[in-house]
């Protein structure tokens, strides 16, 4: 693949960064204007992706699908595009001119550019608006944790972005993740800036701000590294051109970056760290002017001029007598105090610019401050290249510094010289790759990692140039420990862990720095092990946004087809889903659950649905599950089974008294309502019938007839017809499956029992509401006698009505009870189809229910017959129970049979009292 055509080759360590604009004015009025316009400029910053397009055009895909195939295998070739030139090298390291587009800005507008860079960290945000201000103010006033409240929308934003992008636009997706974080950082920064200092809730917001800043830059790193790694994987079999013997430094380094992924990706890390520093430059625009004119050390110059006057009576303290750049060192004399302060401040800002990869801005600043000589010292890193060596019709200009090595040795020595300021030494240490002198000014994790990687790239490039470029004999060389260093990524982080700086060690243990470390190393397994440690150590204390990041990082790896440890990935997803459930992000749960293995997805979503109680919300959750391609039928079945099995109580034997129903508890109410999950989809009517039967069996065993009746009512009346219709629609020539057939029969058995029980309750209530015969008081008056006669007539009328209703109820309840006791085709709660799949628990419960319910029903029937004077029919119960056809005697215990015989004896005695024989027949004399 063609990797040529990079234009001017830049330094391996000093990138051609964007050029900002030089301020021409620095006045109190200017500062006030900059300060007043700060908020307005937040929304008007140039979007990062316009300045530093980390996704070159060849990587971008015009197709953005409306829906995402959640389980599609990734097509890596589509992710990167198939253009002619390697997209990776378009955004290569500082040697090739930085990952950014170089934009030369006019000097007069330098300060204006920097004023917008104050908000550089808060990129990709919407313009400032009144609505946003009102929202922020409301959040600040009402919420206990404004940061958490303001960032809550990120959970849904990330999912929407994930679903919007296909696997071929995965890097656009990562870029969008970064933009979402950037927008949120902008909002949180405004909340923090307007907060009252010292309030606890705003300290939480500041912590949230830092967390999201770290996430934002981690997504940036991820996109940069893995775009290059995937491109490398696609080109690993490519043949690279052999470097010519007389190749220039530029050509050699260009070839090195083409073939060596370590150098290339290390430079990407440097670029990434410099982009972070560039974001954090902040109020640099307010401090770029150090002198009123383009004259350096003007206070010293003024003092020296004054001393030449005969009338001078001021201080005679020692000062330099010459103002060339080397004078203070050569003469070992100081500058004026004000100049020394300005010099220290200038050097610190120059290092800040170089740390941010903004070398040209540093040079411009030097020129503005009258130190053109210092700007020249920052120019010597450019790689030498003479395009005229290979001939050509036109003479082209020579690039770079032919004496770059001498320049570099001078920089190294200057960095070693303790007479210079620590930041001046650090500047030239960075230029020469002198790690020892660079580290003292690196106080943070980012600074330290930048120093190591910058020096590593510089060293590897210098080694390549030394072995591949023919050079003139040079009497001096760079130190052996620099040129002979054996650099690896692992070695960098080992050195980092051995630092004596407490802050760096502490930051090294922070979650996002650990993630960044493993991303740089390309060690996905190591990263998964860290995730596992975090979950085992503080699963419930991990920040929600960190869990969201971990989840989407795993989904990113899966999209690229990279292997992650399955157990850890599952645990991360499960933990994130549990967080979404706790925080009530109902609309998001299904789409993350579908990335779990099917059995776990069913169990996890079913567990979530157990907590959903509102009917409309349940329907909504099932619709979301369908959209996410979850197995809705299995999930709803699992929900019902989970809830109905929560009661560990065993079937218990009924007492033989016709006691009232046991009350319905809250747990019972959950079991009743859970049937709703199975009635949304008509295709699940058979399952609804089976689960409803299972719940009602438990209720009947506990004498909770009202609860059982409520479950029965939950099952749509057309369910049996619907089951048969579905069987016909599927073109099944055979009868219903045995399980469905038996479930229908059981459902009818329960209906018959509930009807009999309800009718008995009506009969029992009516039986005990007999009209009371009026009594005549002793020695009544005539009026009282007349009133008594009227009451007797009314009583006789009421009694007649009551008796007629009682007879009707008695006939009805007898019929319904006989329907249960003499249930057709084998008896009540007995399956007809024996070819069904065995369900030992169900079979056991049905046998127990026969033993619990049928004897009690028999006793109730005897009570009805005996109470209504049908003694002869009472004795016929013995024939029914002992019948070999129905074999009801098998469900009676010895105690129950003894009690039944006792009741039959009482009925026989009543017949004897009526002058009949014990069986109710007339006595034949």
Curated annotation (Swiss-Prot):
The modification N-acetylmethionine is found at residue 1. Ubiquitously expressed in fetal and adult tissues. GO terms for biological process: female gonad development; mRNA export from nucleus; nephron development; nuclear pore complex assembly; nucleocytoplasmic transport; post-transcriptional tethering of RNA polymerase II gene DNA at nuclear periphery; protein import into nucleus. Keywords: Acetylation, Centromere, Chromosome, Disease variant, Epilepsy, Intellectual disability, Kinetochore, Membrane, Methylation, mRNA transport, Nuclear pore complex, Nucleus, Phosphoprotein, Protein transport, Translocation, Transport. It holds the Pfam family Nup84_Nup100. Changing residue 101 to I: In GAMOS7; decreased function in nephrogenesis; unable to fully rescue morpholino-induced nephrogenesis defects in Xenopus; decreased protein amount detected by Western blot in patient cells; affects exon 4 splicing resulting in decreased levels of wild-type mature transcript; impairs assembly of nuclear pore complex. Residues 20-66 are annotated as: Disordered. The modification Phosphoserine is found at residues 4, 10-11, 37, 57-58, 69, 86. It is found in: Nucleus membrane; Nucleus, Nuclear pore complex; Chromosome, Centromere, Kinetochore. The modification Asymmetric dimethylarginine is found at residue 60. One of its GO terms (molecular function) is structural constituent of nuclear pore. Residues 35-49, 55-66 have a biased composition (Polar residues). Changing residue 355 to H: In ODG6; uncertain significance. The modification Phosphothreonine is found at residues 46, 55, 64. The modification Omega-N-methylarginine is found at residues 60, 68. One of its GO terms (cellular component) is membrane. Belongs to the nucleoporin Nup84/Nup107 family. It is linked to Nephrotic syndrome 11: A form of nephrotic syndrome, a renal disease clinically characterized by severe proteinuria, resulting in complications such as hypoalbuminemia, hyperlipidemia and edema. Kidney biopsies show non-specific histologic changes such as focal segmental glomerulosclerosis and diffuse mesangial proliferation. Some affected individuals have an inherited steroid-resistant form and progress to end-stage renal failure. NPHS11 is an autosomal recessive, steroid-resistant and progressive form with onset in the first decade of life. Part of the nuclear pore complex (NPC). Forms part of the Nup160 subcomplex in the nuclear pore which is composed of NUP160, NUP133, NUP107 and Nup96; this complex plays a role in RNA export and in tethering Nup98 and NUP153 to the nucleus. Does not interact with TPR. Interacts with ZNF106. Plays a role in the nuclear pore complex (NPC) assembly and/or maintenance. Required for the assembly of peripheral proteins into the NPC. May anchor NUP62 to the NPC. Involved in nephrogenesis. This is Nuclear pore complex protein Nup107. The gene is NUP107.
């Amino acid at each position: 693949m063609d990797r040529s055509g990079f234009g001017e080759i830049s330094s391996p360590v000093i990138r051609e960064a964007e050029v900002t604009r030089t301020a021409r004015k620095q006045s109190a009025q200017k500062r006030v204007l900059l300060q007043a316009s700060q908020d307005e400029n937040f929304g008007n910053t140039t979007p990062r992706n316009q300045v530093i397009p980390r996704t070159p055009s060849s990587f971008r895909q015009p197709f953005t699908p409306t829906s995402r195939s959640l389980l599609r295998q990734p097509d890596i070739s589509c992710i990167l595009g198939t253009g002619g030139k390697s997209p990776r090298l378009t955004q290569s390291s500082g040697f090739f001119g930085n990952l950014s587009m170089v934009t030369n800005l006019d000097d007069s507008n330098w300060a204006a550019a920097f004023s917008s860079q104050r908000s550089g960290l808060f990129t990709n945000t919407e313009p400032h608006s009144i609505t946003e201000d009102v929202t922020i103010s409301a959040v600040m006033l009402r919420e206990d944790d404004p940061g958490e409240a303001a960032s809550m929308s990120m959970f849904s934003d990330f999912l929407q972005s994930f679903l919007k992008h296909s696997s071929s636009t995965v890097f656009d997706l990562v870029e969008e993740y970064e933009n979402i974080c950037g927008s949120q950082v902008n909002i949180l920064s405004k909340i923090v800036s307007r907060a009252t200092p010292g309030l606890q809730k705003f300290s939480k917001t500041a912590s949230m701000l830092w967390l999201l800043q770290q996430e934002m830059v981690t997504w940036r790193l991820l996109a940069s590294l893995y775009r290059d790694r995937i491109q490398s994987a696609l080109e690993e079999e490519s043949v690279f051109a052999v470097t010519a013997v007389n190749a220039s430094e530029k050509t050699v380094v260009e070839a090195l970056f083409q073939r060596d992924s370590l150098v290339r990706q290390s430079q990407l890390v440097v670029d990434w760290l410099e982009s972070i520093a560039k974001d954090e430059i902040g109020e640099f625009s307010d401090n770029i002017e150090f002198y009123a004119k383009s004259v350096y050390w003007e206070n010293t110059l003024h003092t020296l001029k004054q001393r030449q006057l005969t009338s001078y009576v001021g201080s005679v303290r020692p000062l330099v007598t010459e103002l060339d750049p080397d004078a203070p060192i050569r003469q070992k004399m100081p500058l004026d105090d004000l100049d020394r302060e300005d010099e220290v401040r200038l050097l610190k800002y120059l290092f800040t610019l170089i740390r941010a990869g903004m070398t040209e801005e540093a040079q411009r600043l030097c020129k503005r401050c009258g130190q053109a000589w210092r700007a020249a010292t920052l120019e010597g890193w450019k790689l030498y290249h003479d395009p005229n060596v290979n001939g050509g019709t036109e003479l082209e200009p020579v690039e770079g510094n032919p004496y770059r090595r001498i320049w570099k040795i001078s920089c190294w020595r200057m960095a070693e010289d303790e007479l210079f300021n620590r930041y001046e030494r650090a500047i030239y240490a960075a230029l020469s790759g002198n790690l020892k002198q660079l580290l003292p000014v690196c106080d943070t994790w980012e600074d330290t990692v930048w120093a190591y990687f910058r020096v590593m790239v510089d060293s590897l490039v210098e080694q390549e140039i030394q072995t591949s470029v023919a050079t003139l004999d040079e009497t001096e060389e760079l130190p052996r420990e620099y040129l002979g260093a054996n650099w690896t990524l692992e070695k960098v982080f080992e050195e980092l862990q051995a630092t004596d700086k407490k802050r760096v060690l502490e930051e090294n243990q922070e979650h996002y720095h650990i993630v960044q470390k493993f991303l740089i190393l390309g060690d996905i397994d190591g990263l998964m092990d860290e995730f596992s440690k975090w979950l085992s150590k503080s699963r419930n204390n991990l920040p929600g946004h960190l869990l969201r990041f971990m989840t989407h990082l795993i989904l990113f790896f899966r999209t690229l087809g990279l292997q992650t440890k399955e157990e850890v990935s599952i645990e991360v997803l499960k933990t994130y889903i549990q967080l979404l459930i706790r925080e009530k992000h109902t609309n998001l749960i299904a789409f993350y659950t579908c990335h779990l293995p099917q059995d776990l997805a069913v169990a996890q979503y079913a567990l979530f649905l157990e907590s959903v109680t509102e009917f409309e919300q349940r329907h909504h959750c099932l619709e979301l599950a369908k959209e996410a391609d979850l197995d809705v039928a299995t999930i709803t079945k699992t929900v019902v089974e989970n809830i109905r099995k929560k009661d560990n109580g065993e079937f218990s034997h009924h007492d033989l008294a016709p006691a009232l129903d046991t009350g319905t508890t809250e747990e019972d109410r959950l079991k009743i309502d859970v049937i709703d999950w199975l009635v949304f989809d008509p295709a699940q009517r058979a399952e609804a019938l089976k689960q409803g039967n299972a719940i009602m069996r438990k209720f009947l065993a506990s004498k909770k007839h009202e609860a059982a009746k409520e479950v029965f009512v939950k099952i749509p009346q057309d369910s049996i017809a619907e089951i048969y219709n579905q069987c016909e629609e599927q073109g099944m020539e055979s009868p219903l499956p045995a399980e469905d057939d038996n479930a229908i029969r059981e459902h009818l058995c329960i209906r018959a029992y509930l009807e009999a029980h309800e009718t008995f309750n009506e009969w029992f209530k009516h039986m005990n509401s007999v009209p009371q015969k009026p009594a005549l008081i002793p020695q009544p008056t005539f009026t009282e006698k007349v009133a008594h006669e009227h009451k007797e007539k009314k009583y006789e009328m009421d009694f007649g009505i009551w008796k007629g209703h009682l007879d009707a109820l008695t006939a009805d309840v007898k019929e319904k009870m006989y329907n249960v006791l003499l249930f057709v085709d084998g008896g009540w709660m007995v399956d007809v189809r024996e070819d069904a799949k065995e369900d030992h628990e169900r079979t056991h419960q049905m046998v127990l229910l026969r033993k619990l319910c049928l004897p009690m029903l028999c006793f109730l029937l005897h009570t009805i017959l005996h109470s209504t004077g049908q003694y002869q029919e009472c004795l016929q119960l013995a024939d029914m129970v002992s019948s070999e056809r129905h074999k009801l005697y098998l469900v009676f215990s010895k105690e129950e049979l003894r009690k039944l015989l006792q009741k039959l004896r009482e009925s026989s005695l009543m017949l004897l009292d009526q002058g009949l024989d014990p069986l109710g027949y007339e006595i034949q004399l």
